[in-house]
UniProtKB/Swiss-Prot annotation:
PROSITE patterns: USP_2, USP_3. GO terms for cellular component: cytoplasmic side of mitochondrial outer membrane; cytosol; mitochondrion; nucleus. InterPro entries: Papain-like_cys_pep_sf (IPR038765), Peptidase_C19 (IPR050164), Peptidase_C19_UCH (IPR001394), USP_CS (IPR018200), USP_dom (IPR028889). The keyword Hydrolase applies. Residues 49-344 form the USP domain. Belongs to the peptidase C19 family. Gene3D superfamilies: Cysteine proteinases. Disulfide bonds: none annotated. The active site is at 59 (nucleophile), 302 (proton acceptor). This is Ubiquitin carboxyl-terminal hydrolase 11. One of its GO terms (biological process) is protein deubiquitination. Pfam families: UCH. It comes from the Eukaryota.
Length: 350
């Protein structure tokens, strides 16, 4: 299972979103954005507000913010930390406005200013960027801004003070001597590589991808135990298993739809079915709270968000808000690139 440890996997990638970085990623540079009008789009009795696409390229950050607004555990912790961090305060204010019912679309200006001040980098919005990289950068920045003087878990409805962060356990067992080594790492998401679009699989389930990614056979493995007993025969094979020891309250699942092939940079539109509810380790129950889709190709495209609010599914397409449904959200099997599941009973982690 590919995971995203803090400040390791995407640390270099998200720096390219900001001015001052050496270069822009090839992926971002190839994007030509297509977006809806920034005019006012009001929906009577809507539970959420839209976000203006101010630069014409803001769909990547708008969909991330809309997705976060549906995460109840995040809103709870932001509320508690408003007085200790300007970034927490402006993000909480923005997400609350998004959830405040029908009205004119809003802009995330104050929050983005706080984010730029916190990172001392200017957000590049003149070209389309990657929503997953922006999300990872935001999660890591929130973690760095977290106050360490108070045990917030004592007053939260969930036992950890970082809802995006979990602990992964890696077990490696030698196929020759059966020795087992165990290590732990911090992770914020699951990154899943997808099978080729024309591999013969018309539809692949998310659960099957997660299970296949959880356990891997490694043929070229050097076993320390075998080396001690017979240095000449220390090269062997092993079974590597990666699983959550303590899963996060908010589970991010990234579907990697862009890959490099012999034909260059390509987009993978393989159909991936995903459930509305998910169970980890046979005891941690999750519900799908939001998802981000991307339409287009590697050279142009547009992000939008499907999110659950007040028991109703909505489609947030920048400033345009339309009523959706769970079935419509689950039908985005060829365009979904980022899924947000929130734990239904977080206190079960205690």
């Amino acid at each position: 299972m590919s995971t995203t440890p803090l400040s390791i996997s995407r640390a270099k990638k998200y720096k390219t979103v900001f001015k001052g970085a050496a270069i822009l990623t090839t992926f971002a540079a190839l994007y030509i954005v297509t977006s809806p009008s920034t005019g006012k789009r009001l929906v009577k009795n809507a539970s959420i507000k839209g976000l203006y696409n101010v630069s014409g390229n803001d769909c990547f950050l708008n969909c991330v913010l809309q997705s976060l607004a549906s995460q109840e555990s995040l809103l709870e912790i932001l509320k508690l930390r408003c007085s200790s961090s300007t970034l927490y305060a402006t993000l909480y204010e923005l997400l609350q406005k998004l959830n405040s019912g029908p009205g004119n679309p809003i802009t995330p200006g104050s929050f983005l200013n706080s984010l730029e001040i916190a990172t001392n980098k200017k957000l590049v919005r003149s070209i389309q960027q990657d929503a997953q990289e922006f999300l990872q950068h935001l999660v890591e920045t929130l973690e760095l801004q977290k106050p360490h003087t108070y045990k917030w878990s004592k007053v939260l409805s969930f036992p950890v003070d970082s809802p995006f962060i979990g602990t992964m356990e890696q077990k490696v067992q030698c196929c020759q001597c059966l020795a087992i080594s165990i290590s732990y790492s911090t992770a914020t998401s699951i990154q899943l590589c997808l099978p080729p679009e024309y591999s013969g699989n018309s539809n692949v389930s998310l659960l099957s991808l997660m299970e296949a990614d959880r356990e891997q056979h490694i043929s070229d493995y050097k076993c320390d135990s075998c080396f001690k007993s017979s240095p000449k025969h220390s090269k062997t094979s092993c079974i590597r298993t990666v699983d959550w020891k303590n899963p996060p309250t908010i589970l991010q699942i990234q579907l990697e739809r862009t890959s490099y092939t012999c034909q260059g940079l390509t987009r993978n539109n393989v159909s991936i079915s995903f459930p509305s509810k998910l169970i980890l380790k046979n005891k941690h129950h999750y519900i799908l709270r939001s998802l981000i889709t991307h339409s287009g190709s590697v050279t142009y495209g547009h992000y939008l968000c499907y999110r659950l609010q007040d028991d109703i599914w909505w489609k947030a397409n920048d400033s345009l808000i339309t009523k959706s449904s769970l079935n419509e959200a689950l039908s985005q099997t060829r365009s979904a690139c980022l899924l947000f599941y929130e734990m239904e009973s977080p206190l079960a982690l205690d």
